Amino acid sequence: GKEKENPYDLELYERKMTAIASVLAMDTDVLILDEPTIAQDWKGRQIIGSIIRSLSGRGKLVIAILHDMDFVAENFERVIIMAHGQVLADGTAKEVFAQEEVLKKARLQKPYVMQLSEALGYEKSYLTVEELLKDRMSLCAAIKL
């Protein structure tokens, strides 16, 4: 363990996790995260996503300020895009990410899976790898019948 280390001596990803853990210990009804995925590897992102889903499932409000649209698509039902203090879009991830001009104004990109599904010419737009694989596998299974 690192329980005896000064938090300032920890790596950035460890400090972020420590900060999240300390806020979780307070058991608040609202959690605000500012760029929680910065300095996180895949496992850290998965842990943070799991925490967010768990809190949401318990009726807690999780607000996150993010530029990582893949993480947003994987973990949040409602998305609000802001730029220069103005709300540009508010809706489900699919609704918001379908608004090209809004994304351009906010200097954001669609999630990579959404970009890929559009580049491949799929009629349906996918937000997550899991969603794409599930749908494509069911199409393959239907063709085999």
Cite the ranges covered by each PLM segment.
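Conserved ABC nucleotide-binding domain
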Residues: 1-8
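ABC ATPase nucleotide-binding domains
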Residues: 103-145
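Catalytic Walker B motif of ABC-type/P-loop ATPase nucleotide-binding domains
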Residues: 31-34
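ABC ATPase "signature
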Residues: 90-91
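H-loop/switch region of ABC-family ATPase nucleotide-binding domains
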Residues: 66-67
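A short, surface-exposed alpha-helical micro-motif characterized by mixed small hydrophobic
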Residues: 72-74
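Conserved ABC ATPase "signature" C-loop
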Residues: 84-85
